[in-house]
Amino acid sequence: MDCRTQRLKNRHSRWAETQAHIPLHAFSMSPILRARHHHFRNTGFAFRQCAQKASFSHPSQLKD
């Protein structure tokens, strides 16, 4: 299961929800979010965080 699908499943997490469909209007209003997203894309940190959250939320789906 890829990371984006996992984000869509974690509806309880507002941060996961934001990352799942990156609303452009939110970034235009929030330079902090925009900078944070830019940093995550550059470091790959967002993917590692998602993988960690996914393992806690759905451990059985990550065995493959």
UniProtKB/Swiss-Prot annotation:
Pfam families: YnhH-like. It comes from the Bacteria. Induction: Identified when cells are grown in rich medium (at protein level). Encoded upstream of the pykF promoter. This is Protein YnhH.
